[in-house]
Regions:
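Short, flexible helix-loop junctions that flank or precede catalytic/ligand sites
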Residues: 1-362
C-alpha cells in the first residue's frame, strides 16, 4: 500500500505545495540542476532552487519502504505512489541518467473528480452501465486518461454492487468502497507484472476490471478475452484517433493471428474515448477535447471486415449513438471561445477538414 506522509519542513516539499497551488501536473528533480515544473503542458525551471543528491534522498526517504529503497538501489529505477497528507497524491518515478539521480513526480488530486466535473460525454455514462465489453481511453502522456478512468470507475462504485478489480503500476487514485467492493493491485507490491495479474483475474470473481495500460501482446490478448467472457474491462493506450487504436491492437499480433483478433474486437470492443488537453484561450489551465466511438452493429461489421478506414466515417455519422469526432470537439471549443484557432488546428486529427469547416481565424 502507498504511504501517506505528513509534509516535511523542507524546500522540496515547499516546491510540491507551490506546484500544486499553481496547478502544475509534474515536477522534475535532478541532482545539481534547477527544479523544473510542468504547468499547462509547458516545462518551466524554478530559478534558485538546485537540490543536491543528498537533499533528494532526504526528500524521498520518508516516502519509501525499506524494500523500495533496496529495489531503487539494485535496479536504478523505481515506480511508486504516495499521498501527502491534506495536499495531493504523487505518482513518482526514480531513475538515473548519466549517473545523476532524477525524480519525475506526477501530481494527482486526493479526491476523485466526478464525471460531471471533468465534462465527460454521455457516452461515458453508457459505458459505465455495461455489464461486459472493452472500453479504451487513449491519448498522449499527460492527457488525463487516468483521471477519466477514475471518474468512470467511481461512478460504477457509487451505483452498482459489484467487484471492481484494478491492476496498476503504480496505484494512482485510491477508491473507497461504496456499493462496490474494490480490489486494487499494484505491480511490484501485490503482483509480479500485468500479465500475471490478468491471468489470475479470472479466478478472483471480478465484474469490472481496470488494467492501467495494455503494454504488450499478452496483456492485450488477456484484456480482450476478459471482455469477451463477460467482464466490463477498461484500459488505456497511447494512441490517437479510434481507427488508429484498433489498427494498433490488431497490428501488435502476428499476421496469422490478426483475423482472429479482429473478430474478437468486433465482438468485445464497446467503445473508445480519445482525448487530448489544449490550453485555454484567455485564462490559465487546459481543457479536454475528445473523440468518442461507440461500437454499434455497423462499427462491429467494419472491424470484422477489416475496413478500418471507415471507422472515422462511422463516427461522423453516428451522432444518434453519442459519437463525435475529435475535429467536432475542437470546433465546438474554438467556436465557443475556449481555445484559439491555432491550438485547435494543431490538435486536429484531420487538419484539412478542420480548415475547410471552420475557416481561418477572424
Amino acid at each position: 500500500m502507498a504511504k501517506s506522509v505528513a509534509p516535511l519542513k523542507s524546500q522540496l516539499f515547499d516546491v510540491l505545495r507551490k506546484a500544486w497551488e499553481d496547478r502544475a501536473s509534474d515536477v522534475h528533480l535532478r541532482a545539481d540542476e534547477a527544479v523544473v515544473v510542468r504547468v499547462d503542458g509547458i516545462l518551466r525551471p524554478l530559478e534558485g532552487l538546485v537540490p543536491t543528491t543528498s537533499e533528494i534522498h532526504a526528500f524521498l526517504d520518508p516516502m519509501l519502504r525499506e524494500d523500495q529503497k533496496r529495489r531503487s538501489q539494485e535496479c536504478r529505477e523505481l515506480d511508486f505512489s504516495c499521498e501527502i497528507e491534506k495536499l495531493c497524491r504523487l505518482r513518482v518515478n526514480v531513475y538515473v541518467q548519466r549517473r545523476q539521480l532524477c525524480v519525475a513526480i506526477r501530481l494527482l488530486p486526493q479526491r476523485i473528480p466526478t464525471m460531471e466535473e471533468i465534462y465527460l460525454p454521455k457516452a461515458c455514462v453508457y459505458f459505465c452501465s455495461l455489464n461486459k465489453g472493452l472500453v479504451l481511453v487513449t491519448g498522449p502522456t499527460g492527457s488525463g486518461k487516468s483521471t477519466t478512468l477514475a471518474a468512470m470507475l467511481n461512478r460504477i462504485n457509487s451505483e452498482r454492487a459489484c467487484h471492481i478489480l484494478t491492476i496498476e503500476d503504480p496505484i494512482e487514485f485510491v477508491y473507497r468502497n461504496e456499493k462496490a467492493m474494490i480490489s486494487q493491485r499494484e505491480v511490484g507490491d501485490d503482483t509480479q507484472n500485468f500479465a500475471a495479474a490478468l491471468r489470475h483475474a479470472f479466478r478472483q470473481d471480478p465484474d469490472v476490471v481496470l488494467l492501467g495500460e495494455m503494454r504488450d501482446l499478452e496483456t492485450m490478448q488477456t484484456a480482450i478475452t476478459l471482455a469477451e467472457t463477460g467482464h466490463l474491462t477498461f484500459s488505456t493506450l497511447h494512441t490517437g484517433e479510434a481507427a488508429q487504436t484498433v489498427s494498433r491492437i490488431v497490428d501488435s499480433f502476428p499476421p496469422h493471428q490478426q483475423e482472429m483478433v479482429r473478430l474478437q474486437l468486433a465482438n468485445s470492443l464497446a467503445g473508445i474515448v480519445s482525448q487530448q488537453l489544449l490550453p485555454l484561450k484567455d485564462e490559465k489551465g487546459r481543457v479536454a477535447a475528445r473523440e468518442v466511438l461507440v461500437v454499434n452493429r455497423g462499427v462491429s461489421n467494419v472491424i470484422r471486415e477489416n475496413k478500418l478506414e471507415q471507422i472515422t466515417t462511422a463516427i461522423q455519422t453516428g451522432s444518434a449513438d453519442m459519437m463525435f469526432t475529435m475535429n467536432h470537439s475542437l470546433g465546438y471549443l474554438y467556436q465557443n471561445g475556449f481555445v484559439s484557432y491555432e491550438a485547435a488546428l494543431r490538435a486536429a486529427f484531420d487538419r484539412k477538414e478542420f480548415r475547410n469547416k471552420y475557416g481561418e481565424p477572424v
